[in-house]
Amino acid sequence: MSKEKGIFLIDAVYEKNKESFIKKITGLVKKRRIIGYAGYSSRKDLEKNLLWQVFDENSPDKNFDFDKKKVKKIVKETLRKCLKEVNEKPYVFIFPSYSTFTKLKMGGVGGNFSKHNVMLIFVNTSAKMWEYSLKETLCHEFVHVVSPYYNPWENTIGERIVFEGIAENFQENVLKGRRSIFSKILKEKDCKEIFKKVVNKINSKNSKEHDRFFYGGKKYKRWTGYSLGYLLIKKYLKKNKNIGWISIIHKNPNKILEEIRKDL
């Protein structure tokens, strides 16, 4: 395991035995007084997360070269850019990812919030665009972990639309590059219609309803919630040109949503 000022790089050679492999990786994560086990209160909870984020017995890339030096360099450089906008330094735990979905659908990099100020990043360096995807994911998750309101287990669909929209716009602004795959699903003209479809679920905390709206299902295309959030917040930022990133990230998402709904 490699670490440097809140950046923890965890690596382990792939094993066919799922339980053994996950226990090996979680065994490399020490308990810390403020954040526990990478943001989780127990190793068991961390293991549950890593089982689907890291392990994939059908992965074609069980022996890819996890370039720790390059990964760390990208993480440090990207975080430096984020901190220029919002000076709240997070803990970052980086793991290799053997997930086929992460490689094929997410550019080789996935990430999630585990606790306020703690993010987990999962990297497959055999994916073609993994380096840029790593930058995108870091910027996106940075917004989530420094927000005083973000909690994926408690947030409503409406709050989540706002959070994902802020994260996507922040990422685009910081990297000054292309739009992410998540933001391209919808066009601006689609926003009103999609919002009407989901408005009766706007206060829902039901995880299945969240999954259908953000990750796709019969009614919605994959990444619909992300794309809707991106477009709505893009419009909101144009209208509120003087609002800075610190202000919008620390603003109650329900107040933002209320303002957005008036303009739809």
Spans of features found by a protein language model:
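N-terminal low-structure segments adjacent to metalloprotease catalytic domains
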Residues: 1-69
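Post-HExxH zinc-binding segment in Zn-dependent metallohydrolases
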Residues: 2-9, 157-197
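Pan-zinc metallopeptidase signature
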Residues: 29-30, 200-264
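Auxiliary, metal-adjacent structural segments of Zn-dependent hydrolase domains
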Residues: 59-116
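Short pre-active-site segment immediately N-terminal to the catalytic Zn-binding motif
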Residues: 122-137, 158
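Hydrophobic (often cysteine-bearing) scaffold residues that line and stabilize catalytic clefts
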Residues: 135, 159, 163, 225
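Active-site recognition of the HExxH zinc-binding catalytic motif
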Residues: 136-149, 168
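Inter-helical turn/loop segments and adjacent helix faces that build the functional surface
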Residues: 149-157, 176-182, 239-244
